[in-house]
């Protein structure tokens, strides 16, 4: 695709991890903070593949922990860009699991991560994202609605910050 548009696949990052005891919490499932760290890591690479500019993590939205990861599981984390606007881009992340002793596969989590370019305005302008698969088309079709919701959430946060007690 051209520099002004990319497919979701051109931004795809896949990362595999075996669950070890150091990853586990007191419930013997992978600690949520460990998952969030992996999410931020892989999604930032997808964002960089799309824009080749310095960007920062702005939000993690709709983090849904669907099924836990335990010892003898593998995690496959897939991240790809699902939308861009003036200075921001959205990355969808899904965590797929595999029980290594049985081969059974499952969805462990999903979320969206928003990144914002440091440059204002973004230079060069952010590319348009072109979905190809059914999954990508479904996710990209909801980008505009999620963008509107993020703006509403940001306005709410501004009001909340004014009322936070720092003592």
Specify the residue positions occupied by each region the protein language model found:
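Buried hydrophobic packing segments
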Residues: 35, 39, 43-47
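A conserved, well-ordered hydrophobic junction motif at loop->secondary-structure transitions
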Residues: 22-38, 164-166
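Hydrophobic beta-strand-centered segment that forms part of the acyl-chain substrate-binding groove
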Residues: 2, 10, 30, 44-78, ...
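HotDog/MaoC-like acyl-thioester-processing domains
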Residues: 3, 13-14, 70-71, 82-167
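Short amphipathic
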Residues: 8-21
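A short, mixed-charge helix-start or loop-turn motif at secondary-structure junctions
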Residues: 2-4, 8, 24-25
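Hydrophobic residues in beta-strands and at strand termini
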Residues: 19-20, 65, 115-117
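Hydrophobic pocket-lining residues within nucleotide cofactor-binding pockets
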Residues: 24, 60, 117-118
């Amino acid at each position: 695709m051209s520099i002004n548009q990319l497919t979701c696949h051109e931004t795809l990052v896949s990362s595999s991890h075996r669950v070890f005891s150091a990853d586990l919490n007191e419930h013997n499932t992978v600690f949520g903070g460990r998952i969030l760290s992996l999410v931020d890591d892989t999604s930032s690479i997808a964002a960089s593949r799309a824009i080749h500019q310095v960007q920062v993590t702005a939000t993690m939205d709709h983090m849904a922990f669907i099924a836990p990861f335990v010892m003898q599981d593998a995690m496959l984390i897939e991240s790809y860009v699902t939308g861009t606007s003036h200075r921001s881009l959205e990355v969808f992340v899904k965590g797929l699991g595999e029980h290594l002793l049985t081969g059974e596969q499952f969805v462990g989590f999903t979320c969206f991560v928003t990144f914002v370019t440091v440059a204002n305005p973004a230079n060069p302008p952010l590319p348009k994202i072109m979905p190809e698969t059914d999954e990508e088309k479904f996710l990209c079709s909801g980008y505009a609605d999620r963008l509107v919701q993020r703006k509403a959430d940001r306005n709410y946060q501004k009001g909340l910050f004014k009322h936070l007690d720092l003592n």
